[in-house]
């Protein structure tokens, strides 16, 4: 089969992996690679801006890989908020569907992520600003009907101006059981996700924000469980062992009898648990690290907490204009059918001017 290539592309090895990039993007430099693909940075000749280019590894290897690739493309395309990573461009060197095997996602380049800088000592002002941005991003994602489910420091990208963007949202639902080589980080996960003990809603992500904020305050992972049971034990040491009202909501009979077998204990005093935290920070943490999903704050409610008063701008707390369309989510399609859908999206893609914050916080990492 002859591989006819489009004009305007060039081949280059980036960290021993062959990349075929549009000529608009120059000076590719390897950034990292993982189970799902590799990322390089490059300069967009048109704007002079640095971008991140992600090449998915073997997107059409199986139905699961192809479906995940389609979902990632659509999610990135849908999200248009300054605190959520979105799609600047998408391209393929293939000139037709027949020779379409790879595609590249272009996003804003961010210097680092929270995991890499967790050892820093964060001032309360920095914590306010970073957590405020996490919640703004989550309010937007949730308003589109998407739940992150796997929020952790490693998928919160930040730059030197303390601007934050949420990565890898909405992909976790496929990742756990189906993708090999994927390790679930349970430390930041809400107990109802780890244990499937009760219905869950969008506040699973708020629990994760609570864990991340606590770690920024103390420099230590809050709940570092060795396994699922140890994770639950560590959580209950902080939240207290809940009473009958909570236990009645549990769907899982084993979880129910386990909780009932434990002596009831009160919640720890958060001002003592987090001596560095201001009373408002401790109060917010207490409301985010709430075992009962019906009582836990939503992102929109958390944004109104007095802790964020110095940075709050309700005009920036926007919602998605329409819900994310996952109508193909439940379809059983072949690899070739997913491929057609993806190719069509790439061919029809037109970049949207992405707005960034109207103001600068003045905070530096």
UniProtKB/Swiss-Prot annotation:
Disulfide bonds: none annotated. Pfam families: Pkinase. The active site is at 150 (proton acceptor). A motif (TXY) lies at residues 180-182. Keywords: ATP-binding, Cell cycle, Kinase, Nucleotide-binding, Phosphoprotein, Serine/threonine-protein kinase, Stress response, Transcription, Transcription regulation, Transferase. InterPro entries: Kinase-like_dom_sf, MAP_kinase, MAP_kinase_CS, MAPK13, MAPK_p38-like, Prot_kinase_dom, Protein_kinase_ATP_BS. Its cofactor is Mg(2+). PROSITE patterns: MAPK, PROTEIN_KINASE_ATP, PROTEIN_KINASE_DOM. Dually phosphorylated on Thr-180 and Tyr-182 by MAP2K3/MKK3, MAP2K4/MKK4, MAP2K6/MKK6 and MAP2K7/MKK7, which activates the enzyme. Dephosphorylated by dual specificity phosphatase DUSP1. One of its GO terms (molecular function) is ATP binding. GO terms for biological process: intracellular signal transduction; stress-activated MAPK cascade. The modification Phosphotyrosine is found at residue 182. ATP binds at residues 31-39, 54. SMART domains: S_TKc. It catalyses: L-seryl-[protein] + ATP = O-phospho-L-seryl-[protein] + ADP + H(+); L-threonyl-[protein] + ATP = O-phospho-L-threonyl-[protein] + ADP + H(+). The modification Phosphoserine is found at residues 47, 350. Interacts with MAPK8IP2. Serine/threonine kinase which acts as an essential component of the MAP kinase signal transduction pathway. MAPK13 is one of the four p38 MAPKs which play an important role in the cascades of cellular responses evoked by extracellular stimuli such as pro-inflammatory cytokines or physical stress leading to direct activation of transcription factors such as ELK1 and ATF2. Accordingly, p38 MAPKs phosphorylate a broad range of proteins and it has been estimated that they may have approximately 200 to 300 substrates each. MAPK13 is one of the less studied p38 MAPK isoforms. Belongs to the protein kinase superfamily. CMGC Ser/Thr protein kinase family. MAP kinase subfamily. This is Mitogen-activated protein kinase 13.
């Amino acid at each position: 089969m002859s591989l006819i290539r489009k004009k305007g592309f060039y081949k280059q090895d980036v960290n021993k992996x062959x990349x075929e990039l549009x000529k608009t993007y120059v000076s590719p430099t390897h950034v990292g690679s993982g189970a799902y693909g590799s990322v390089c940075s490059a300069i967009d000749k048109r704007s002079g801006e640095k971008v991140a280019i992600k090449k998915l590894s073997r997107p059409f290897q199986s139905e699961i890989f192809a479906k995940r690739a389609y979902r990632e493309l659509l999610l990135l395309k849908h999200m248009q908020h300054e605190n959520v990573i979105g799609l600047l461009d998408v391209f393929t060197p293939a000139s037709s569907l027949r020779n379409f095997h790879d595609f590249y996602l272009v996003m804003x380049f961010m210097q680092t992520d929270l995991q890499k800088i967790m050892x820093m000592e964060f001032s309360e002002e920095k914590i306010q600003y970073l957590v405020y941005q996490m919640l703004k991003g989550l309010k937007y994602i949730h308003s589109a009907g998407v739940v992150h489910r796997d929020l952790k420091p490693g998928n919160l990208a930040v730059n030197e101006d303390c601007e934050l963007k949420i990565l890898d949202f909405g992909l976790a639902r496929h990742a756990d059981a189906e993708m090999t080589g994927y390790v679930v980080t349970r430390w930041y996960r809400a107990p109802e996700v780890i244990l499937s003990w009760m219905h869950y809603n969008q506040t699973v992500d708020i629990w994760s924000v609570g864990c991340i904020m606590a770690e920024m305050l103390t420099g230590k992972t809050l709940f570092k469980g060795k396994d699922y049971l140890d994770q639950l034990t560590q959580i209950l040491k902080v939240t207290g062992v809940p009473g009958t009202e909570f236990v009645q909501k549990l769907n899982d009979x084993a979880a129910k009898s386990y909780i009932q077998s434990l002596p009831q204990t009160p919640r720890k005093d958060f001002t003592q648990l987090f001596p560095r935290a201001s009373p408002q920070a401790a109060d917010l943490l207490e409301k985010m690290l709430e075992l009962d999903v019906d009582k836990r704050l939503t992102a929109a409610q958390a944004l109104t907490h007095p802790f964020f008063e110095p940075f709050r701008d309700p005009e920036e707390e926007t919602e998605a204009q329409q819900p994310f369309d996952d109508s193909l989510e439940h379809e059983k399609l072949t690899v070739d059918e997913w491929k057609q859908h993806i190719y069509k999206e790439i061919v029809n893609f037109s970049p949207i001017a992405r707005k960034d914050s109207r103001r600068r916080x003045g905070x530096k990492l």
